[in-house]
């Protein structure tokens, strides 16, 4: 297994924070990525301009991801 795969595997089922280029933020459990680099999250909450909403399962295309961090 290569270093990138090891790192990605260590993030599975962890809580992550993703910000996309339109300034929305998503916090959810990281499930996987697809071949195009999209992040798939479950139990996700979206935060936008002071409001939040529960979304559940979401797919965030990699080309829209501004930042990705694993929460402690």
Swiss-Prot record:
GO molecular function, one term: RNA binding
Keyword Endoplasmic reticulum: yes
Classification via SUPFAM superfamilies: Sm-like ribonucleoproteins (SSF50182)
Keywords (A to Z) from UniProt: Endoplasmic reticulum
Organism superkingdom: Eukaryota
GO CC, alphabetical: endoplasmic reticulum; membrane; NatC complex
CDD domains associated with the record: LSMD1
A biological-process GO annotation: protein maturation
Subcellular location, record wording: Endoplasmic reticulum
Sm domain residues: 3-72
Subunit structure: Component of the N-terminal acetyltransferase C (NatC) complex, composed of the catalytic subunit Naa30, a large auxiliary subunit Naa35 and a small auxiliary subunit Naa38.
Function comment: Component of the NatC N-terminal acetyltransferase, which associates with the ribosome to acetylate nascent protein chains in a cotranslational manner. NatC acetylates protein N-termini starting with methionine, followed by a hydrophobic or amphipathic amino acid, with amino acids at positions 3 and 4 also contributing to NatC recognition. The first 4 amino acids of cognate substrates are recognized at the Naa30-Naa35 interface. NatC-dependent acetylation targets various substrate proteins to specific subcellular sites.
Protein name: N-alpha-acetyltransferase 38, NatC auxiliary subunit
Biological source species: Schizosaccharomyces pombe (strain 972 / ATCC 24843) (Fission yeast)
Gene name linked to the record: naa38
